[in-house]
């Protein structure tokens, strides 16, 4: 199965995920082993140009994270802390990154319109799920398939070139309007349990990676 984030019905944050001024979602606040708080989202939302194995055009550790988003009127709330580097032409673990908030006490751990995640569960076919996203708000869907392998193509503004990478162990959610551009990084929830992180989609389904 192949899903390309191109202009129109498909989405992967914005049609060209590496523009260093994105809009997407901070999935939710996670507590690290040392007790500090980080904001979890997609690498293509938070981290911009560093997600490939190419020579990077921007050193994004410390890159400002803006709220409500780089395409909106904004204020800086966090900086990029760490990310999973994507494997050009290979297999990538996930499209994910963490940001360090300036004022952890200001972070609301709840998800707008949903509950506070209290556990993590695996996706299973037939599971009813919800997500709260920047573009489409709170939507309900059903996990259609698990253990899905999908090839994603990311385009890079700085060079007007692209690279592809495979993601294994993904799951899909239907219907197609479960997510849309700007919803990348949303946490897929089942009740009060986090199921995965939304990172891409087409006009027929959305793709997530398990937590």
Predicted regions and their residues:
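Serine endopeptidase catalytic core focused on the charge-relay Asp
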Residues: 2-169, 189-191, 195, 199, ...
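Hydrophobic alpha-helical bundle architecture
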Residues: 173-193
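A short acidic/small-residue loop/turn micro-motif
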Residues: 202-203
